[in-house]
Structures are given as C-alpha cells and as structure tokens.
Amino acid sequence: MRESFSIAGLVRPELEKLMPYEAKLYPEAIKLDANENPYPFPESLSSKIGELAAGDVLSRYPDGAALELRRDIAEYVGTEPEQVMVGNGSDELILNILLTFGTGGRVLITNPTFSMYKIHSQIAGARPIPVPRRGDFSIDVPALVCYARQPEAKVVFLCTPNNPTGNSTTLEEIEGVLQQVSCLVVVDQAYLEFGGEDALPLLKRYPNLIILRTFSKAFALAGLRVGYMLANTDVLRQIEKVRQPFNLNAFSQAAARTVLANRDVFKEQIQTVLEQREVVQRGLKSIKGVDSYPSATNYILFRTNHDSKVIFQGLLERGVLIRSLGGPELPGFLRVSIGTPEQNTKFLQALDQVMQQVGRD
C-alpha cells in the first residue's frame, strides 16, 4: 500500500506563517515604487559589457571568487580585496550572514526598516526581535544596546540611510552601539551614494562590523543583482562556508566592473536625482493634506490622513506606481522613488488630484 504524502508535516514550523514575496507588475504605470535608478542604462556601457562577456565567458563557469570585481570594489571604497565579498544582490548576503551567525539566536531589527531582515531571519531559523525607532525614526541606542547585550543576541541590523524612512544614522550612533556589544552589527548602506555618512572608517576599529552595499540603486544594475559586503577577514572566512559556489554570474561581474570603471557617468545621474529630490519635496509640501519627511536617499517618505491603500490606488488609476506602507508602524504612510523630471511632475499632479478627490469623498 502506498504511503500518503502530506507536505504539512515536512515544512519547518517557523515557515508556516511566512508568505512568499510577491512583486506585482503594473507595466502601464510609471514605476516609482522600488527606488531604482530611473534612467536607462547607458548604451555606450552596454556595449563594453558585451565585450567583456564575449568568447567563452558565457559558456564557462564564472570566477567563483570574483577576484577582479573584488579588486575593483576595494579600489572604489578604499579597502583590501580580502575584506570584500560579492553576492547575488544584498539579499543573498543578508541570508548568508544569518545562516552563518543567526540560526537559533535573536536578530535585532530597528523597525520600521527594510522588511527582508525579518524574512531572512525567519528563513534562517533565527528569531527576529523588533527594537522600535523613535518618533523621528532615529535609532534608540540605549534600547538597542540593552537587547544586543542579552546572551541570545547574534546580529543587529542597522539600515542607513534607512529604508523606507529615508533618514540616516550618524557614525556616532553606530559607534555607540559597536562599543557596547559583542554581537555582529550589520550596517546596510545600499543608498550611501545618495547621502548619509560612510561607515567604512569604523571597520578598522570594530571586528564585529559588517557593511552592506549594492549596485542596484545608484549604479542602475537592479536587473543583474550585484551586492557586496565589507568585513573583517575572519568574519568573511566563516560566511564563505555557506556561500554558494559561482554565486555571481559572469555577466553581472562584467557589468559591475564596467560600472565602476565609468562611475563618473553615474555621478551625473546621482546629482540629477538629488536635485529632483528637492523638487519633489517642494511639490509635496505644496499639496494640502500631505506631510513629507527629510530624505538622504533617492526616495521620500510621506503621509496623509487617509488610508495609504486608497492613495496608492488613486495614483495607480492615474498611471503612477509608488509604495504603499501602512500597518501599525507607518499608518497612512507611502514612499515614492525619485524619477525623471517628467515622471516626478506626473506624480505630483496625480497626487494633488487624488488628495482633492479623497477630500471631497
């Protein structure tokens, strides 16, 4: 007699309430929801990437150590290649950190912040512990240190500039945590090219510091998923044990190297985004019923007195896609990425129309 199969008994208990991540597609809308570089990737650089990926590069496994890319990154940030690890986006690196150090322990997350810290903690079999930020979204250093000094605390995540709030944590605050804890402190600086203080100077003094960065935002490689981390060699040596072989494909490695060699092109785009950020801030402040928050990033957090889903849907009906936040931590809040001047104008016009409509309803 054939045994009956029940998948329920095989799934890890901590995954039962975890929902698959879904990124819905709205191809007809202006996409201002994911904090991407709004400008097309330069054609001149696309051809250079093609040259690097020619011949047998695509038919052979990539350099598993990504040595040339790590050398380029080290030169860009000002460290040694041995202190650099690359990954298939920062998500892979976050998960690998947690698989190495977090499983079975507590992971401290300064909510509201990047949602994937909690999700990857659950996947890795760690227990995510929220340590709420203050009313102005700054981190509560004393509370964080108190939690981090408990025996089961393994990893602290600090996102700066913080997603989705847009504010940055000072080096003094980061060091205030590092000085008082013995667990790992992961400082996610995905948006550093747009603002905030570089945490790299702290790396020499604190062996428990890990810094995360990415090519997805300022460098327009979100579609190729290239992230990297900077850490003490002893820390990276342990994470190497869980890293998948050949985890970053040859094409992505070639693209990242090309971007770094031509980063002046992206500096111009970054400057334009920063200028447009101020335009959008002024526009938001001019719309009745909208409160916006300061930003050190390529997006702006704002809130209204209405359900964020209603505002989101009203914008979508007018061809603009942004991020609806809501929930108990951010009621009525939304986040908009900075787009091109034309996209930003359409967003502001659409939001003004939506706010007038909900005000009449």
Give, region by region, the residue ranges found by the protein language model:
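PLP-dependent aminotransferase-like
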Residues: 99-158
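Conserved PLP-binding catalytic core of the aspartate aminotransferase-like
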Residues: 273-274, 284-318
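Short acidic capping loops at alpha-helix termini that bridge into adjacent secondary structure
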Residues: 80-84, 105-106, 189, 207-208, ...
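N-terminal "arm"/small-domain region of PLP-dependent enzymes with the aminotransferase-like
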Residues: 1-60, 145, 152
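PLP-dependent enzyme catalytic core of the Aspartate aminotransferase-like
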Residues: 172, 314-318, 323, 327-361
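Phosphate-binding glycine-rich loop
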Residues: 67-106
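Active-site phosphate-binding strand-loop segment of PLP-dependent enzymes
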Residues: 135-193
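PLP-dependent aminotransferase class I/II
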Residues: 208-286, 291-293
